Amino acid sequence: MNVKGKAILSMLVASTVIVVFWEYINSSEGSFLWIYHSKNPEVGDVRAPMGWWFPSWFNNGTHIYQEEEEDVDKEKGRKKEQREKDDREELQLWDWFTPEKRPEVVTVTSWKAPVVWEGTYNSAILENYYAKQKITVGLTVFAIGKYLEYYLEEFIASADRYFMVGHKVIFYIMVNNVSRMPPLELGPLRSFEVFEIKAEKRWQDVSMMRMKIIGEHILTHIQHEVDFLFCMDVDQVFQDNFGVETLGESVAQLQAWWYKADPNEFTYERREKSAAYIPFGQGDFYYHAAIFGGTPIRVLNITQECFKGILQDKKNDIEANWHDESHLNKYFLVNKPSKILSPEYCWDYQIGLPSDIKIVKISWQTKEYHLVRNNV
């Protein structure tokens, strides 16, 4: 075959191949097999398979990725909502309180309030709950006259060590002479505020007037600064952790000398003329005014009602046997406390140490009345 014949043959073969290829790719079976196994059913252009596959893959991939992101976000949202719900939910008594662990003592009152003894509470559950709340606890203390020099420094030092460890605390210190304040060094999360008040001529009046003063400070600033507030006598010392197990709406302290006595033996005010009067046959416990507390609003109510009774007695020319403590007992008889602290939280070692006192949280200081009760 000559050169011209070969050229013609080559052209025929090439034309045949082109025609066959063109028919194939436009047939129902033709495709770019390495990209997609069938033609785009909507687009007849040979470029359609590639043009459809790339954006479709990208868009589908993005859609799946977005769905995964949305699922993750929804799960995070659900967990956050659950955490916020847990934070808002009130801690239930039986979540942390096990009264049957102390069968030898009274652990629940007739009105179902807990009496907190060592061994009846779960510290871990309580700490976890209150840590989430980010609480601040206030503590008022009065150091008037010689009480300042004899007791204040040790009281604050021991409170700094044992009172509400790990939580923010504000000490409200009431003195009649700021210049005699000892230097105070406090740990992290602790601060103090000092207020100068008038010294009364009688220690009884100092004791009773504190109700008025505490109420005034709650109204002007304390209610905006703390979540819970305790009011304590200065002539005692912390010896072990006084923690969040003591927190409640209204908290009363059992008096160490009377916690086993019959109510008819209590030294309640028995004279009908007094606003603090409690007749024989009535009464639940004898409460110690050395420690009481609760939410600021409830403590405000306690102090206002007690001071109202004190003023009524003054008007009627009578003074309750145990002054503000008598009025406090009358208040808690009418307005039952939501939580009671066992004598372990305010113990007098002169009683000894009976078997039901497992650990002493606060102890009374030696009462040097002949030295400290002259406040002039």
From Swiss-Prot:
The active site is at residue 325. GO terms for biological process: carbohydrate metabolic process; lipid glycosylation; protein glycosylation. Its EC number is 2.4.1.87. The keyword ATP-binding does not apply. Its main location: Golgi. It comes from the Eukaryota. The chain crosses the membrane at residues 7-25. GO terms for cellular component: Golgi cisterna; Golgi cisterna membrane; vesicle. One of its GO terms (molecular function) is metal ion binding. Mn(2+) binds at residues 233, 235. InterPro entries: Glyco_trans_6, Nucleotide-diphossugar_trans. Residues 1-6 are cytoplasmic. The keyword Lyase does not apply. It holds the Pfam family Glyco_transf_6. It is found in: Golgi apparatus, Golgi stack membrane. Pathway: Protein modification; protein glycosylation. Keywords: Glycoprotein, Glycosyltransferase, Golgi apparatus, Manganese, Membrane, Metal-binding, Signal-anchor, Transferase, Transmembrane, Transmembrane helix. Binds 1 Mn(2+) ion per subunit. Residues 26-376 are lumenal. Signal peptide: none annotated. It catalyses: a beta-D-galactosyl-(1->4)-N-acetyl-beta-D-glucosaminyl derivative + UDP-alpha-D-galactose = an alpha-D-galactosyl-(1->3)-beta-D-galactosyl-(1->4)-N-acetyl-beta-D-glucosaminyl derivative + UDP + H(+). Belongs to the glycosyltransferase 6 family. The conserved DXD motif is involved in cofactor binding. The manganese ion interacts with the beta-phosphate group of UDP and may also have a role in catalysis. This is N-acetyllactosaminide alpha-1,3-galactosyltransferase. It comes from Loris tardigradus.
